[in-house]
């Protein structure tokens, strides 16, 4: 499960923490992972990840949100030991473009190296939208996305060859 916390203009309060605690206890009972995604919410993300140390609680890295909201903060280094999910997509730093990887300005070799060094063993998950790809058929878009995911996986594993 991936949860979006409030942005840092709306600092999470004790009631919010209590509600998350209830969700996390239920998730632990059912062995469900609860991850918190980086948005414009790094203070809230810090609070939640430092409050809940359960093995079922972790971090969902979103590459587009990283570039847009915290480009100077090494989020993978900071939370890599808690990394449980990836939302990978590209942009040029303007807004949440959700482009396919390698169509924007993200330095994918560096990102995937950091992910590899974090010890993350999960899937390489893309989160693109077809806004910039309306000229492609659905099948062409999916084929291209699959090729890009494979390329990211290659970058992730090249570190250990």
Residue ranges of model-derived segments:
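Histidine-acidic metal/acid-base catalytic patches
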Residues: 42-161
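Active-site acidic/histidine proton-transfer and metal-coordination neighborhood
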Residues: 1-58, 68
């Amino acid at each position: 499960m991936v949860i979006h916390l409030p942005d840092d203009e709306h600092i999470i309060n004790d009631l919010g923490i209590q509600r998350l605690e209830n969700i996390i206890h239920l998730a632990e009972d059912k062995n469900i992972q609860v991850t918190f995604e980086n948005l414009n919410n790094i203070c809230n993300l810090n609070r939640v990840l430092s409050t809940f140390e359960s093995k079922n609680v972790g971090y969902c890295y979103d590459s587009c949100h990283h570039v847009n909201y915290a480009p100077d903060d090494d989020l993978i280094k900071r939370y890599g030991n808690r990394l449980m999910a990836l939302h990978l997509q590209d942009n040029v730093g303007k807004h949440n473009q959700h482009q396919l990887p390698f169509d924007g300005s993200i330095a994918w070799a560096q990102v995937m190296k950091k992910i590899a060094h974090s010890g993350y063993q999960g899937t390489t998950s893309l989160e693109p939208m077809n806004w910039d790809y309306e000229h492609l058929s659905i099948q062409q878009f999916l084929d291209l996305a699959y090729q890009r995911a494979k390329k990211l996986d290659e970058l992730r594993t090249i570190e250990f060859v």
